[in-house]
């Protein structure tokens, strides 16, 4: 029998592993020479270089439609954090650095997630 990873022992151990990885990423970001975009402009820029539209709601087989409605909320909340962000030369855009953790306390709702080849629902789901 193959030895299990610590994160596979229980949901609690999985959570500890996730928190460890987040902490390591934050430490790497702190000491990294990468400069993340953080400056925001409230006024719209004078030119639109690229625009894109996608349908937000899709009826998926075997998926509760409420998860699609929640996705709209999650995208709106994340969009508010990204809106107006200026990426200057030499800077890097990081979705997760800009948006941060998607928690219920911040208003994020359960949305559709895909992990390990399975559909699920997690707070902040639907952003990818």
Labelled PLM ranges:
Residues 1-127:
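Well-ordered beta-sheet/strand-loop patches within structured domains
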């Amino acid at each position: 029998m193959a030895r299990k990873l610590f994160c596979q022992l229980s949901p609690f151990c999985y959570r500890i592993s996730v928190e460890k990885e987040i902490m390591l990423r934050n430490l790497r970001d702190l000491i990294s020479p990468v400069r993340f975009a953080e400056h925001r402009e409230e006024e719209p820029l004078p030119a639109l270089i690229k625009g894109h539209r996608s349908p937000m709601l899709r009826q998926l087989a075997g998926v509760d439609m409420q998860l699609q409605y929640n996705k709209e909320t999650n995208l709106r909340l994340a969009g508010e954090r990204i809106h107006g962000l200026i990426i200057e030369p030499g800077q890097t855009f990081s979705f997760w650095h800009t948006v941060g953790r998607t928690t219920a306390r911040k208003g994020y709702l359960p949305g559709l997630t895909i992990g390990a080849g399975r559909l699920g629902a997690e707070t902040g789901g639907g952003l990818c």
